[in-house]
Amino acid sequence: MKVDGRSPWHLWAVGLIALLWNGFGCFDYTMTQTRREDWFAQMGMTAAQLEYFNAMPSWTHAAWAIGVWGGALGAVLLLMRRKWALHVFVVSFLGWLAGAVYAFALSDGMEAMGSMWPMQVVIGAACLFFIWYAWTMSKTGVLR
């Protein structure tokens, strides 16, 4: 890709999608951490899911925070065309990965999540896509 100082159109599209995606994650994190009962009801969480969530160790909540807030920061850095976007997206992925390991290997998270467990796979795939995209833009000289 020839870099002429302007951002390619897809950088803005991917950056905006990343910001919206991770922005929702930040909103969900905030609403969940502040124990908004109306949010739990709106999300359709069952009593068993709330019990599972309330029993999660604090390190999983920290990993979740790193995942969502790191993803939002990565999106902003991507829109600013900064190479640090790649590193921040990797840290965000590691936050997601820590939570996924707990949910799928160290607890009965898959059972507790019910039909929502595939969403974790979608989130992980989105993280990997944003890493790949930032890496590609970095290698082609779009990110500085």
Question: Each PLM stretch: what is its role?
Answer:
Residues 1-144:
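Topology signature of small-to-medium multi-pass alpha-helical membrane proteins
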